[in-house]
Curated annotation (Swiss-Prot):
Protein name listed in UniProt: Leucyl/phenylalanyl-tRNA--protein transferase
Domain of life: Bacteria
Function according to Swiss-Prot or TrEMBL: Functions in the N-end rule pathway of protein degradation where it conjugates Leu, Phe and, less efficiently, Met from aminoacyl-tRNAs to the N-termini of proteins containing an N-terminal arginine or lysine.
Organism this protein belongs to: Shewanella frigidimarina (strain NCIMB 400)
InterPro entries referenced in this protein's UniProt entry, alphabetically: Acyl_CoA_acyltransferase, Leu/Phe-tRNA_Trfase, Leu/Phe-tRNA_Trfase_C, Leu/Phe-tRNA_Trfase_N
A Gene Ontology biological process term: protein catabolic process
Catalysed conversion reaction: N-terminal L-lysyl-[protein] + L-leucyl-tRNA(Leu) = N-terminal L-leucyl-L-lysyl-[protein] + tRNA(Leu) + H(+); N-terminal L-arginyl-[protein] + L-leucyl-tRNA(Leu) = N-terminal L-leucyl-L-arginyl-[protein] + tRNA(Leu) + H(+); L-phenylalanyl-tRNA(Phe) + an N-terminal L-alpha-aminoacyl-[protein] = an N-terminal L-phenylalanyl-L-alpha-aminoacyl-[protein] + tRNA(Phe)
Key word Aminoacyl-tRNA synthetase present: no
Length: 235
């Protein structure tokens, strides 16, 4: 029977296979959110998820929600919409604003887990070149976006948001296009939910996810792929 691990100042984690089954995937408690610990967590297939004012909780659920990068991504109606849209798309031009957008209130939630502490932790990771954002612009207004952490040839998605219909889906379509161009193998979406299912996510057993992660996590990627840049959607 697996038991919950308590972290100290060391950045080490127990093996993800030791995570609890109830609640599904809870692996460890405690520690901190400094960049080296966060980077090590994603490298091992672990991520933080906890409510504000609660202890830090670390997870590795079974199964794992994943996407295989594909282009073009989205339904026929989304592609038709984007062909007519005047939106602009960028990479890493407004990381903090994207994270703040993801932290905003949602109709389906009473609050958000993306506290000020979380926002600054991922911003530090971004400053070190380990966390990146996709932005969707309507003129000068940020209307949608997403952020996440690449680990070799795997992209670990954290959150997305929209202020106009289809803006988060557009950001995800741009992410897919960008990852396909750079030969990424998998998008980790963490915990399955109805929204992810509607986008085409698949449930992958944790053992299979970890096998793929271990295979591709040390793969070198283009140093310039996450430079600040404007991206043009291709059809």
């Amino acid at each position: 029977m697996n038991s919950l691990s308590y972290l100290n100042q060391s950045i080490g984690f127990p093996p993800p296979e030791q995570a609890l089954t109830d609640p599904n995937g809870l692996l460890a408690i405690g520690g901190d959110l400094r960049p080296d610990r966060l980077a090590q967590a994603y490298y091992q297939g672990i991520f933080p998820w906890f409510n504000a004012n609660d202890p830090i909780l670390w997870w590795s659920p079974d199964p794992r929600a994943v996407f295989t990068p594909s282009h073009p991504f989205g339904s026929k109606s989304l592609i038709k919409f984007l062909k007519k849209s005047a939106w602009r798309f960028t990479i890493n031009q407004a990381f903090l604003d994207v994270v703040a957008g993801c932290a905003g209130p949602r109709n389906t939630q009473d609050g958000t887990w993306i506290s000020a502490e979380i926002q600054m932790a991922y911003y530090e990771l971004h400053l070190q070149g380990h966390a990146h954002s996709i932005e969707v612009w309507d003129g000068e207004q940020l209307v949608g976006g997403l952020y996440g952490i690449p680990v070799g040839g795997i992209f670990c998605g954290e959150s997305m948001f929209h202020r106009q219909t289809n803006a988060s889906k557009a950001a995800f379509a741009i992410l897919n296009q960008h990852l396909v161009k750079h030969d990424f193998q998998l998008i980790d979406a963490q915990v399955m939910n109805p929204h992810l299912v509607s986008l085409g996510a698949k449930a992958l057993p944790r053992s299979e996810f970890l096998t793929i992660l271990h295979q591709y996590r040390d793969r070198a990627t283009s140093a310039s792929m996450w430079n600040k840049q404007e991206v043009f959607i291709e059809f």
